[in-house]
């Protein structure tokens, strides 16, 4: 009998969202969004679920619903930096698997969370694991808001980009720049899913790594790890994840799903 990989789930929750202020505390069926996310992480089998925030109101909401919470600095440039502070404070062993569950994804699949944690444990040469799924729509390939990842033969990340990678020259070139006329990609193209599992060792070193030029150009923080020689294992899944909550329209859509009459 195999046992699930032990892991810790940390949910970074920043209150000062530009597009949707107070997002972690938005009501979803009588509970704050961040609590709904924590429930998903607990359902995934995390041995500990921690909500990390710079806002006391978020910590109070977490504790009111039975979740551990930790106060972090307000000046973190990314969720990974916030996780790094938590990892340093908690003193986890180097190989502890820590999953960063985004605080604005109340519909995240618990199975995917668990599988990404297990994927990291199965790849001891990698510091990070994440996930991706195949893209079949050319419009998504050319959408800069859809982050793509190119993989090697072992499904380890070669590069992440907002650009179409790999570029299917023979399929795309005759139609460029008419994106609407583009056929489906000739080679597999994968959409990155923003779910990460880290080794605690890497999290503790992350703040000391200089920002990478490619990270700044693409505005993708995972490129910092690649730039500094770390390996990222990518779990390929056929199931596209549920959309997160970034805008008021997203919030209204998700709130409708949590209404009692939506069952």
From Swiss-Prot:
Origin organism of this chain? Burkholderia multivorans (strain ATCC 17616 / 249)
Query: Taxonomically, what lineage is the organism?
Result: Bacteria, Pseudomonadati, Pseudomonadota, Betaproteobacteria, Burkholderiales
Name of the molecule in the record: 3-deoxy-manno-octulosonate cytidylyltransferase
Per the entry, what this protein does is:
Activates KDO (a required 8-carbon sugar) for incorporation into bacterial lipopolysaccharide in Gram-negative bacteria.
Query: Which Gene Ontology molecular function entries are recorded, alphabetically?
Result: 3-deoxy-manno-octulosonate cytidylyltransferase activity
Which UniProt key words apply to this protein? Cytoplasm, Lipopolysaccharide biosynthesis, Nucleotidyltransferase, Transferase
**Reaction catalysed by this enzyme:** 3-deoxy-alpha-D-manno-oct-2-ulosonate + CTP = CMP-3-deoxy-beta-D-manno-octulosonate + diphosphate
InterPro entries the record matches: Cytidylyl_trans, KdsB, Nucleotide-diphossugar_trans
Instruction: Output the GO biological process annotations, alphabetical, semicolon-separated.
Output: CMP-keto-3-deoxy-D-manno-octulosonic acid biosynthetic process; lipopolysaccharide biosynthetic process
Please state where this protein is localized.
Cytoplasm
Protein family: Belongs to the KdsB family.
